[in-house]
Amino acid sequence: MWSDILGLALFVSLNPLLLGFILLVLSRPRPVPNLVVFWVGCLIVNVPGFLIPLFVLRAVPSFAEFAEDLTTADPSSGIEPFQLGTGIFALAVSAVIALRMWVKRRANQPVLVGSGAGDRGPTDDASTLVLDSGAREAREPGAIARMILRMRSALQRLVSRLHQEWENGALWVALVFGLAYIPPPPLVLLVDTIIGGSGAPIGTQIIAVFVFIMAMLAVFEITLLSYVIAPRRTQAVLEPLHEWSHRHRQMILLVLFGAVGIWELIVGLGVI
């Protein structure tokens, strides 16, 4: 059991999604405290995420077969629904990020202004006045339009507030990111099946769950331990990494979601 869960934890620790989260957190002010809070958030969500299914599997053996049917490939088509859905979602997020980067790049390009504005005649001016009058009437919002405008304004204020908190390095943002690192059901089922099928006492199985989670987050522990032992040297390594990840934050997200989406899509379609 121990060799199986440690080997699996080492493989999961190299997950590009987890590495991308680290780079994303490092792109914020106060990277080390944000890493600590992110690590705590991961523990908060992963400990019950692995323990509760383990207790359920021990209490209801028939539930293990039901959970396995939900996460395994279809015998006829070879399609794995969970992985396929995850891949489609990740690719959709990657496409949205790429579109936003393209729109921002287009908006930053200089706009050439023509020189024909001074050649307008009286007819053009009259037409402009008529069009302006009609445009003013069309711009008068109704009740539904005013409600939509208020909702959009409130949403813009919320997004602006969240962006401000992100730029200021608020620790609760890192905690939310840590809580969002939820273990995927196939991984939970695999780990709990290995641990539960070992026949070890319940106390040993609980310890095995904690060992797996700590090994899965080994990148965080190594970074934090290095900072405690040699803060200056660790900071010297973190600062250039922090600056690089801050400059390429959007690209990191794009590559991260794209790579995860393609991999999950390939697995979900049964290619591998």
Curated annotation (Swiss-Prot):
InterPro entries for this protein: Gap/Sap
Keyword Iron: no
Transmembrane segments: 5-25, 36-56, 79-99, 171-191, 206-226, 252-272
Disrupted-gene phenotype: Deletion mutant synthesizes GPL at a level similar to the wild-type strain, but is unable to transport it to the cell surface. GPLs are retained within the cytoplasmic compartment. Mutant is not able to slide.
Biological-process GO terms, alphabetical: lipid transport
Protein's name according to its UniProt entry: Peptidoglycolipid exporter Gap
Family: Belongs to the peptidoglycolipid addressing protein (GAP) (TC 2.A.116) family.
Membrane topology term: Multi-pass membrane protein
Job of this protein: Required for the transport of peptidoglycolipids (GPLs) to the cell surface.
Keywords from the named record: Cell inner membrane, Cell membrane, Lipid transport, Membrane, Transmembrane, Transmembrane helix, Transport
Natural source organism: Mycolicibacterium smegmatis (strain ATCC 700084 / mc(2)155) (Mycobacterium smegmatis)
One GO term describing the cellular component: plasma membrane
Protein's cellular compartments: Cell inner membrane
